């Protein structure tokens, strides 16, 4: 099981990510697209990196908006995996 990060580690990692916010024990970003088709295309681009990492985000789709939430459920909070996947997602257009 992945090890939980300390509050100091979480703040340090979060400061390196643009467009992500800490919401309790979760890391979140919301992306806005031109339309539903572009939003779904973005979600489809998340499949490969999530599968490769063995770490899957929670995803909410609302027409042209996609909210991505990361947390390590089995550890009960944020781990390095969450920040690694967030960094990868940040590079996806």
From Swiss-Prot:
It is an enzyme of class 4 (lyase). It catalyses: (4aS,6R)-4a-hydroxy-L-erythro-5,6,7,8-tetrahydrobiopterin = (6R)-L-erythro-6,7-dihydrobiopterin + H2O. PANTHER family: PTERIN-4-ALPHA-CARBINOLAMINE DEHYDRATASE. GO terms for molecular function: 4-alpha-hydroxytetrahydrobiopterin dehydratase activity. NCBIfam families: PRK00823.1-2. It holds the Pfam family Pterin_4a. InterPro entries: PCD_sf, Pterin_deHydtase. Belongs to the pterin-4-alpha-carbinolamine dehydratase family. Coiled coil: none annotated. Keywords: Lyase. Its EC number is 4.2.1.96. SUPFAM superfamilies: PCD-like. GO terms for biological process: tetrahydrobiopterin biosynthetic process. This is Putative pterin-4-alpha-carbinolamine dehydratase. Gene3D superfamilies: Transcriptional coactivator/pterin dehydratase. It comes from the Bacteria.
